[in-house]
């Protein structure tokens, strides 16, 4: 859903894509925080994937922040170590695919989190399209 207007995103908007070699450094990965709940063997990584300016311009987006909560049983991996693995797998999937868009990035995250140590992935996205 477009967070500015409240309208649903159409299938055309969600599948709109650009060749990955046309946009240098298309994604910015940021770890927001890492939680270690008490008395559990889980670690929760809060990861934000941001589309850079050139990619937003090519897809007619005003703002695109994809927020993921990754619940894992991986106690050994620090936040930066997990973020590097996550980033590598997402970009590997997108480079193999050759195109990048909103749905393709979400599919790449599903590919990156399809591991035995990942329990759950929660998504909360902030997407705004240009009016004009």
Swiss-Prot record:
One of its GO terms (biological process) is viral process. Keywords: Host-virus interaction. Belongs to the geminiviridae replication enhancer protein family. It comes from Bean golden yellow mosaic virus (isolate Puerto Rico-Japan) (BGYMV). Homooligomer. Interacts with the replication-associated protein (REP). Interacts with host proliferating cell nuclear antigen (PCNA). Interacts with host retinoblastoma-related protein 1 (RBR1), and may thereby deregulate the host cell cycle. Oligomerization and interaction with PCNA are necessary for optimal replication enhancement. This is Replication enhancer protein. InterPro entries: Gemini_AL3. The lineage of its organism: Viruses, Monodnaviria, Shotokuvirae, Cressdnaviricota, Repensiviricetes. It comes from the Viruses. Increases viral DNA accumulation. Enhances infectivity and symptom expression. The keyword Signal does not apply.
């Amino acid at each position: 859903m477009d967070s500015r207007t409240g309208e649903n995103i159409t299938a055309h908007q969600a599948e709109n894509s650009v060749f990955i070699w046309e946009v240098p450094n298309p994604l910015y990965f940021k770890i927001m925080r890492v939680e270690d709940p008490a008395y559990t063997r889980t670690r929760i990584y809060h990861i934000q994937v941001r589309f850079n300016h050139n990619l937003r311009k090519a897809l007619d987006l005003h703002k695109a922040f994809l927020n993921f909560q990754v619940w894992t049983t991986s106690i050994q991996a620090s936040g930066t170590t997990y973020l590097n693995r996550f980033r590598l797998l997402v970009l590997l999937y997108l480079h193999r695919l050759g195109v990048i868009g909103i749905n393709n990035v979400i599919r790449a995250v599903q590919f990156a989190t399809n591991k035995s140590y990942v329990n759950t992935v929660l998504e909360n996205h902030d997407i705004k399209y240009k009016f004009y």
